[in-house]
C-alpha cells in the first residue's frame, strides 16, 4: 500500500488562479494525494502556493506567502503566474521553494514526488508564451493541449475518481472544488491577444484560447450537480470568446445554454472589453432569464489620448454612450470597472477627463490602481513618468471620489426589489448574500433579514432598506417565491 501523501494549496490572485488550483487539486486527488487544509492547522508534506505576478504588490504578497509556508517545515512549491513569469530567476532568489511552470501542471504528481524525494526540480527559463501557439487563432486548439492549464483532454477517463472530482468526460481535466458554497468560477478561455502597453499578462499567460462550448457546458453541468447555483465565467477577455473557434458571437450563444442547465439560476460574466461589447451581447446580458445584467467593463481610463498611449481604444464620450446603452436596456444593471492612475504622460487634463467620466457614469463598483512599471512591458520604457507622490495624491483623490459615487449608486437602490443569493448565515440570525449586481468578493454584499428560515443557496426576493457604502441591507419578501 502506498504511503499517505498530503498536499495543501494556497491560492493568490484572481478567479482564474482559483480554477487552476482546483485543476491541480483534481489531478492530485485522482493520483492518490490527500488534500489538507492549512487553515485548519493540518500539516502537509508539500505546500503549493499558486502565486500572482500581476503587479508589484501581488508579487510581494506571493513571496511573503512562500516564505511563510517554508517556515512551517513543509516542502514548498511555487506555481502560478509569478513562478511562470520568473522561473529560474525566482528559484535562485528563493531557495526555500521549488519552482514549476504551467507546462508542469499535467505532470504535477510526478513533480511533487520528486520534491518529496529530495530531487531538485530544474526551473524553467521564462519565454514569451504567446510564441507557443500559432499566430492564427483558429489553429491554436490542438497545440494548446500541452501548454495551457485547463485545456488538456485526457485520452481516457481516470477511474475510480475520489468523491467530488469531476471526470474527464465533464471538464476536460479533473477538477476538485476547494471551497464550498453556491458560487463557482468557470473558465471559458485563457490568455490574451491584446497588446496593452502596461500589461505583461499575455507574455506569461499566452495567446488567447477559447474552451470549446461543449467542454464548458459539461463542466457547468457537473458544477450544478455539486450544488452550484451561480456560475461566474472567467477569462482574461471574455468578449473575445469564440474568435479562435470561428464564431465571434459564441459568447452570445453560450450564455443562454448555460442558464438553461437545471440547477443553475445565475450566470455572470467577467472582464468585458468595451471596444468588443456588441449590441447583440448587451441584448443577451440584459434580456436572457438566468443571465444577470452585470457588466465588468475594462475601461482603464477615460482620456482618449492616454488610452491610445496605453494601446487601447475609446474615450469618455464613447464609454458614456456604452453605459447609457446598457442602462437603457436594464436600469438595474450592475457596472464595474478598474482604472489606472498616473500612467506615463498623464496630464492634469487627462486626469480631469477621468474624474468627469466617473462623476457622469455612476458606476456600481470602481477599482483604482496607481501605475507602476512592469518588467517587459512597453510602458516601462515610456518617458513622462510621474513622481510617486503625484500618483499617490491622484489615487487618494479618486478613491475618495469612488467611495462617494459608489455609495450614491447603492442608495439609488433603496426601496427597490432585488433577488439575493444566500451565501452565509450570520451569528445574529441574519443572512449575507449578493444581489444580481454584486459579483463575488469585489462588489460588496447584501445583509438580509428574514422571519422565516433560509438556507445557503436560496435565491430570495427582498426589498432594499438602506445602504452602507456599496453594501445593501434588505428584508426578505415573505409572500414571494424563493428559488
From Swiss-Prot:
Domain TRAM: 411-478
GO molecular function: 4 iron, 4 sulfur cluster binding; aspartic acid methylthiotransferase activity; metal ion binding; protein methylthiotransferase activity
A Pfam family matched in the record: UPF0004
Domain annotation MTTase N-terminal: ranges: 5-117
A single GO BP: tRNA modification
E.C. designation(s): 2.8.4.4
InterPro entries assigned: Elp3/MiaA/NifB-like_rSAM, Methylthiotransferase, Methylthiotransferase_CS, Methylthiotransferase_N, Methylthiotransferase_N_sf, NA-bd_OB-fold, Ribosomal_uS12_MeSTrfase_RimO, rSAM
Catalytic activity: L-aspartate(89)-[ribosomal protein uS12]-hydrogen + (sulfur carrier)-SH + AH2 + 2 S-adenosyl-L-methionine = 3-methylsulfanyl-L-aspartate(89)-[ribosomal protein uS12]-hydrogen + (sulfur carrier)-H + 5'-deoxyadenosine + L-methionine + A + S-adenosyl-L-homocysteine + 2 H(+)
Location of the Radical SAM core domain: 178-409
Transmembrane segments: none
Residues that coordinate or bind [4Fe-4S] cluster 2: 192, 196, 199
Needed cofactors: [4Fe-4S] cluster
PROSITE patterns attached to this UniProt entry: MTTASE_N, MTTASE_RADICAL, RADICAL_SAM, TRAM
Principal location: cytoplasm
Function as written in the Swiss-Prot or TrEMBL entry: Catalyzes the methylthiolation of an aspartic acid residue of ribosomal protein uS12.
Protein name (database record): Ribosomal protein uS12 methylthiotransferase RimO
Organism (species): Thermobifida fusca (strain YX)
Name of the encoding gene: rimO
Amino acid at each position: 500500500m502506498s504511503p499517505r501523501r498530503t498536499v495543501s494549496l494556497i491560492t493568490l490572485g484572481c478567479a482564474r488562479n482559483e480554477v487552476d488550483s482546483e485543476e491541480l487539486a483534481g489531478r492530485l486527488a485522482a493520483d492518490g494525494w490527500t488534500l489538507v487544509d492549512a487553515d485548519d492547522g493540518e500539516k502537509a508534506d508539500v505546500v503549493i502556493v499558486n502565486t500572482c505576478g500581476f503587479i508589484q504588490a501581488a508579487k510581494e504578497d506571493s513571496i511573503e506567502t512562500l516564505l511563510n509556508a517554508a517556515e512551517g517545515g513543509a516542502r514548498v512549491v511555487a506555481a502560478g503566474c509569478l513562478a511562470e513569469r520568473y522561473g529560474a530567476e525566482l528559484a535562485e532568489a528563493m531557495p526555500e521553494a521549488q519552482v514549476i511552470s504551467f507546462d508542469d501542471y499535467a505532470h504535477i504528481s510526478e513533480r511533487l514526488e520528486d520534491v518529496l524525494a529530495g530531487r531538485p526540480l530544474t526551473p524553467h527559463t521564462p519565454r514569451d508564451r504567446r510564441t507557443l501557439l500559432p499566430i492564427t487563432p483558429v489553429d491554436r486548439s490542438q497545440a494548446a493541449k500541452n501548454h495551457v492549464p485547463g485545456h488538456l483532454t485526457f485520452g481516457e477517463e481516470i477511474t475510480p475518481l475520489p468523491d467530488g472530482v469531476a471526470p474527464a468526460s465533464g471538464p476536460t481535466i479533473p477538477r476538485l472544488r476547494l471551497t464550498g458554497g453556491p458560487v463557482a468560477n468557470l473558465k471559458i478561455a485563457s490568455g490574451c491577444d491584446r497588446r496593452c502597453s502596461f500589461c505583461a499578462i499575455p507574455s506569461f499567460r499566452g495567446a488567447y484560447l477559447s474552451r470549446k462550448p461543449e467542454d464548458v457546458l459539461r463542466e457547468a453541468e457537473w458544477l450544478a450537480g455539486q450544488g452550484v447555483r451561480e456560475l461566474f465565467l472567467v477569462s482574461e477577455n471574455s468578449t473575445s470568446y469564440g474568435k479562435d473557434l470561428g464564431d465571434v458571437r459564441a459568447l452570445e450563444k453560450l450564455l443562454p445554454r448555460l442558464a438553461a442547465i437545471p440547477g443553475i439560476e445565475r450566470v455572470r460574466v467577467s472582464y468585458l472589453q468595451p471596444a468588443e461589447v456588441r449590441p447583440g451581447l448587451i441584448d443577451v446580458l440584459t434580456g436572457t432569464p438566468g443571465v444577470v445584467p452585470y457588466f465588468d467593463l475594462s475601461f482603464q481610463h477615460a482620456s482618449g489620448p492616454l488610452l491610445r498611449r496605453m494601446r487601447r481604444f475609446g474615450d469618455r464620450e464613447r464609454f458614456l454612450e456604452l453605459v447609457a446603452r446598457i442602462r437603457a436596456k436594464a436600469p438595474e444593471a450592475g457596472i464595474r470597472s478598474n482604472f489606472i492612475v498616473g500612467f506615463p504622460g498623464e496630464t492634469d487634463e487627462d486626469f480631469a477627463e477621468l474624474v468627469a467620466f466617473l462623476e457622469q457614469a455612476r458606476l456600481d463598483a470602481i477599482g483604482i490602481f496607481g501605475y507602476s512599471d512592469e518588467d517587459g512591458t512597453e510602458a516601462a520604457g515610456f518617458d513622462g513618468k510621474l513622481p510617486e507622490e503625484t500618483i499617490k495624491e491622484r489615487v487618494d483623490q479618486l478613491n475618495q471620489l469612488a467611495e462617494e459615487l459608489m455609495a450614491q449608486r447603492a442608495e439609488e437602490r433603496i426601496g427597490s426589489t432585488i433577488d439575493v443569493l444566500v451565501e452565509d448565515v450570520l451569528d445574529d440570525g441574519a443572512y449575507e448574500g449578493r444581489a444580481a449586481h454584486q459579483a463575488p468578493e469585489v462588489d460588496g454584499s447584501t445583509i438580509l433579514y428574514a422571519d422565516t428560515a433560509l438556507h445557503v443557496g436560496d435565491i430570495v426576493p427582498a426589498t432594499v432598506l438602506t445602504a452602507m457604502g456599496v453594501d445593501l441591507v434588505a428584508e426578505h419578501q415573505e409572500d414571494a417565491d424563493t428559488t
